[in-house]
């Protein structure tokens, strides 16, 4: 809970800076890249998390890795290092994306199907969801053969379960 609050607070501040610099998308990509590196590179993670390594040394290391970034992006990475919040990068990125989606009327939708839908089926689903919600839809599709057929759509807290598995479970319970 506290980690989510921290992520939200930092994400809001970073988003505000990104808006004022007109680089919202670029900064998201930067933060996402930092998160990927933090999650996959043990040496990087160890270095930025190690309490005995001075912050200035951590910043120098980050500058060597991210030196090609524009100054505002690099300063945000430095700020997160200064505040010992780089370890919270996953939560910050998730909250940043939520803010971006909310401000740009984008809805994150997860669709689970028994088999991979065609491009046309995905496009039709996106079109119907956009028409229903009045928002642009970011569709993430996953496959789960255990649902047998049909699909499950998750929009925020709402779940629309049209799977054969659920229908069979309903019949079995009655």
From Swiss-Prot:
Q: Name one GO biological process term.
A: sodium ion transport
The UniProt keyword set, sorted, is: ATP synthesis, Cell inner membrane, Cell membrane, CF(1), Hydrogen ion transport, Ion transport, Membrane, Sodium, Sodium transport, Transport
Instruction: List the PANTHER family hit by this protein, alphabetically.
Output: ATP SYNTHASE DELTA CHAIN
Annotated GO molecular function terms are: proton-transporting ATP synthase activity, rotational mechanism
Q: Which domain of life is it from?
A: Bacteria
Q: Which gene encodes it?
A: atpH
InterPro entries recorded: ATP_synth_OSCP/delta_N_sf, ATPase_OSCP/d_CS, ATPase_OSCP/dsu
Briefly state the protein's biological role: F(1)F(0) ATP synthase produces ATP from ADP in the presence of a proton or sodium gradient. F-type ATPases consist of two structural domains, F(1) containing the extramembraneous catalytic core and F(0) containing the membrane proton channel, linked together by a central stalk and a peripheral stalk. During catalysis, ATP synthesis in the catalytic domain of F(1) is coupled via a rotary mechanism of the central stalk subunits to proton translocation.
Q: What are its GO cellular component terms?
A: plasma membrane; proton-transporting ATP synthase complex
Q: Where in or outside the cell is it found?
A: Cell inner membrane
Q: How does it assemble?
A: F-type ATPases have 2 components, F(1) - the catalytic core - and F(0) - the membrane proton channel. F(1) has five subunits: alpha(3), beta(3), gamma(1), delta(1), epsilon(1). F(0) has three main subunits: a(1), b(2) and c(10-14). The alpha and beta chains form an alternating ring which encloses part of the gamma chain. F(1) is attached to F(0) by a central stalk formed by the gamma and epsilon chains, while a peripheral stalk is formed by the delta and b chains.
User: What lineage is this protein's organism placed in?
Assistant: Bacteria, Fusobacteriati, Fusobacteriota, Fusobacteriia, Fusobacteriales
Official protein name in the record: ATP synthase subunit delta, sodium ion specific
Membrane topology, as annotated: Peripheral membrane protein
Species per Swiss-Prot/TrEMBL record: Propionigenium modestum
> Which family would the database say this protein is a member of?
Belongs to the ATPase delta chain family.
Q: What else is known?
A: The ATPase of P.modestum is of special interest because it uses sodium ions instead of protons as the physiological coupling ion.
